[in-house]
Curated annotation (Swiss-Prot):
Residues 65-96 are annotated as: Disordered. Belongs to the UPF0729 family. The lineage of its organism: Eukaryota, Metazoa, Ecdysozoa, Arthropoda, Hexapoda. Pfam families: DUF4512. Residues 75-96 have a biased composition (Low complexity). InterPro entries: UPF0729_C18orf32-like (IPR026776). This is UPF0729 protein AGAP000931. It comes from Anopheles gambiae. It comes from the Eukaryota.
Length: 96
């Protein structure tokens, strides 16, 4: 059986950090940044997914296809050659 403090303390810590602490920090926050006059410096949290100034930091880089490179993939002849080899291997196993 689990002792009562081993169950109650983690639950209370979770409730404190999830619900109570954010409410209290809105009214009393000793760690907030202040200017020389003692006024709170308001900074909005920066969202890393915002696209500011027409530039998105998380957009994928577009790469140009080199000349002479086939972006489609291997040719049909190469696909049939590999499938013939697979069929030959399968038929040889059946004959044994």
């Amino acid at each position: 059986m689990v002792c009562v403090p081993c169950f109650i303390v983690p639950v209370l810590l979770y409730l404190w950090h999830k619900f109570v602490q954010p409410i209290l920090l809105k009214y009393w926050n000793p760690w907030e940044k202040k200017d020389a006059d003692g006024n709170m410096i308001k900074t909005e949290p920066k969202n890393p997914f915002d696209c500011a100034g027409g530039v998105c930091r998380w957009a994928g880089k577009k790469t140009a296809v080199p000349p002479g490179h086939d972006p489609v993939g291997p040719t049909v002849a190469a696909d049939t050659a590999t499938s013939d080899a697979v069929d030959d291997a399968a038929s040889s196993k059946k004959t044994l």
